[in-house]
Amino acid sequence: MPRFFRATCKISLFAAALLCGGFTAKAATYYVSQSTGDDSLDGLAAAKAGAKGPWKTLTKASIQYKPGDSILLKKGDTWNEELTPKGSGTPEKPILISSYGQGNKPLIDREDFKQDRTGIRLDNQGGYKIVGIEFARCMTGIYAEYAKGAPTQKYLWIEDCYFRDSLLYGRYEDYPKRKIGLGVCLFSWETDKKIVMQDIMVKNCVFRRLASGFWTNSPDNFNKNASFVYNFANLNFENCLFEEGYQWQLGIRGVIKGSVKNCVTHDIGRGFRSFNGVAGAMFFRCKDWIFEDSEWGFVDIGLGSGDGEAFDFEGNCDNMIMRNCNFHDTDGPGFLLCCYASDGHPNMGIVMENCVINAKSKRPLQPRVRAAIINTTDWTEATWNKCRFYLSKGEGIMTVMDREKDKRSTFKDCFVKNLSAACSSPKHPAQMTEMAAAAGATGPTFLLDFGRTVSINEFKLKEDPASGISRYIIETWDDKKSQWKSCFNGMGIGGEFVCAIVPQTTSKARLRVIANRKEKTVLTAFDAYNDPPGDPLNVARGGDTPNRPGK
């Protein structure tokens, strides 16, 4: 065959292969180092070698990327810049933003959370996996925005990230004019019933000292004209910690399908006053969610905020299932089932299974009612199945603000108990051992070894006056998985403190002291019980919840 025809055939075959997808560009890995990088290099190597080597700035790294590409930030380095990568990945080949090297997480520190500064910004993009990055003093750590009419994006994975120190709080009714410090915000300009972003995972992340942790939002922040409009889908949280924040750490609006599993929300609202209430979490206009093995505790109304509940279904939430969750130590109710505050649609299909509510309702402000549950209308459809209610003196089970003939609350195989009667049976015999401080803690660990498998539903703690424990975690040993599992996150102990937990079966328990206000740590009692659950509580649909205040 003549050379001309051989060349022509090769070119034709190459073109055909491109058209058929036979060739794909090889994924590239880019390196960025504030300490050793140079923007004149190609970014394709971790160490400098001729023209190869890491970039220096996130501005330089804000280029077009292809599916499967990686952007790696050097551990131990710090940037006061925004990373705005271009392009999208796919669920199968996401664009990875992560780290390389040794040391602490790479840090994006914007230095002033009162300025509208972001750590990573996405614009109508999907297919990103963000792993192992720290965000500090950003008004928003990760901000992703989606335009009206934009095509649906898929896949956003955020794992092992640390969001901290953004306590700006202003009246944010006109958001996205940003006036509030957030860890992550997904914002949709779409007003139609259309999904703009789906398949989102937030895993093993810490949100600390933020006005609010994670938001989904739209231009009408309170969504009064957006009934049953869902712009986000399949949003999942797993093994995350939210603590020392101001307002609701999960502010979730307009999301169909999602989950919260093995998450802890702790110490919310102190030293702060909100214009529209405080809660551990607030969900509005959401559907088809599952919450499992999670905890919301120590929610404070601070300097005069309203509400103060552990959890708030704000309205228009349908088919929401909560299993094995603990709601405790709140200034307001343990649980708020709200309506009217937003669009007026009641919550439907709320199911609570094997949950513990030990609210205490220490200082309710708005409304001035002490109850484990505040339900704004009998039209709320909620089923409480095998739940346990601990009532402090004068605290009721449920208060309904607007009474209706159609009462849709049901209590089945539940129990109600005075908190003062807790830990009244014989404690489990156990050997308590004090051990040195564990990683990440400033105090010792106290271990209870029962020598056999026991069932536990309550702990009693006592502390010497010379001690000042201010943060601790109680964990039980999972024999099947051979690992420790959190069952209660606490603050002060004082003379005596009762920790009611979701029932556990275990052979060991431990208390890890995380923080102490004083030099000494002296725990005089760490006792475990399988106490009687209290009085049966059964209310059929249409019935009235008994007036049974705690004693």
Regions found by a protein language model. Give the residues of each.
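Bacterial N-terminal signal peptides
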Residues: 10-22
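Right-handed parallel beta-helix
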Residues: 94, 101-103, 126-137, 152-169, ...
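Aromatic, loop-rich ligand-recognition surfaces of beta-strand-rich domains
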Residues: 428-432, 437-488, 492-550
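Extracellular beta-strand/beta-solenoid scaffold signature
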Residues: 84, 110-121, 137-149, 171-194, ...
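Acidic Gly/Asp/Thr-rich repetitive segments characteristic of extracellular carbohydrate-active
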Residues: 34-80, 84
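Acidic, glycine- and Ser/Thr-rich low-complexity intrinsically disordered tracts
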Residues: 52, 69, 176-187, 380-395, ...
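Bacterial N-terminal signal peptides that target proteins for export
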Residues: 1-13
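Right-handed parallel beta-helix/beta-spiral solenoid domain characteristic of secreted/periplasmic
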Residues: 72, 88-140, 165-179, 488-493
